Amino acid sequence: FALKENPRAGIHIWLPKVQLQIQMDVIVEVKTGDITIPYWRDVPTNSRVAYGTIPSPGTVIESPLAYNHKPDQKRFAVLVCDIQSIKLLLLGVKHIRAHYKKSTNWQGEWLSP
């Protein structure tokens, strides 16, 4: 997993009805093994095939259908995200932008949009 080597990631959310953009900087912990079993049970049966393609996704194959889907809980992971900062941008006649950081105990600051 690339996230195990560099656990920093970004989550970006766009809420079109309210014209709000949310950006979060996170540190990701990848959980695998038995701890994921309760979460695996919540994955719909027809969606589990995404966690067992053989050969692995991205592998060169001889023909378009030269692969199998066999669900495999061992290839399932749970990502736990520790939010480090949140940036909000509200679009409107006058845009509003704010930034909150865990390192400042979530005390916000206004930013120029």
Located regions from the model:
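Charged, gly/pro-rich active-site loop segments
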Residues: 20-113
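A short mixed-secondary-structure module that forms the rim of ligand-binding clefts
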Residues: 1-19, 27
